[in-house]
């Protein structure tokens, strides 16, 4: 679910930045409705992830990982979940306050959450935008931390996040194979 969320967030941000660049009013509205639909999907997926998270065992930390890094990892995870839940709700509230609606993937309308209120809609758009940029920053921090663990600390943090079929051997174990060590056996033995 991690990578599905990541892919959907990439799509949501691409749509958000494309809406105002749309060549026509029709494509503008189509991008906007798709952005809203994918945002609702992210919210549902995040709720499912939280349920899964509450039932699943927490992943093992690298044994040499300092307590401060563990606290930072948990805090950033909770912050990501909070923003992933808040962002679509703010978007839905803003849409309702504008007097607009969400056509969920063009197959059905979601009900308005609040009555039309244009001044509130502007404030909600500001909040939605601020949370969006906060999410981008937190996602950048998340990716940077994963790369730091993989390339600097050489632990299994990044590989543990990969889908099972795509898992690579961690950097720390790459030289452990006899054929890759400095004193490698003859090619026939490999």
Which residues fall in each region the model found?
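Membrane-embedded alpha-helical bundles that constitute the cytochrome b-like, heme-associated redox core
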Residues: 1-190
């Amino acid at each position: 679910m991690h990578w599905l969320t990541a892919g959907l967030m990439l799509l949501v941000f691409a749509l958000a930045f494309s809406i105002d660049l749309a060549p026509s009013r029709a494509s503008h509205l189509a991008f906007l409705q798709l952005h809203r639909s994918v945002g609702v999907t992210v919210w549902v997926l995040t709720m499912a992830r939280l349920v899964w998270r509450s039932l699943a065992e927490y992943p093992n930390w690298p044994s040499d990982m300092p307590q401060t890094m563990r606290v930072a990892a948990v805090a950033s995870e909770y912050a990501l979940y909070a923003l992933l839940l808040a962002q679509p709700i703010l978007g839905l509230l803003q849409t309702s306050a504008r007097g607009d609606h969400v056509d969920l993937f063009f197959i059905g309308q979601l009900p308005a959450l609040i009555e039309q209120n244009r001044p509130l809609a502007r404030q909600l758009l500001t909040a939605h935008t601020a949370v969006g940029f906060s999410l981008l920053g937190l996602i950048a921090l998340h990716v940077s931390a994963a790369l730091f663990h993989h390339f600097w600390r050489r632990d299994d943090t990044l590989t543990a996040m990969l889908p099972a079929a795509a898992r690579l051997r961690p950097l720390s174990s790459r030289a452990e194979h006899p054929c890759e060590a400095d004193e490698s056996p003859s090619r026939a033995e490999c």
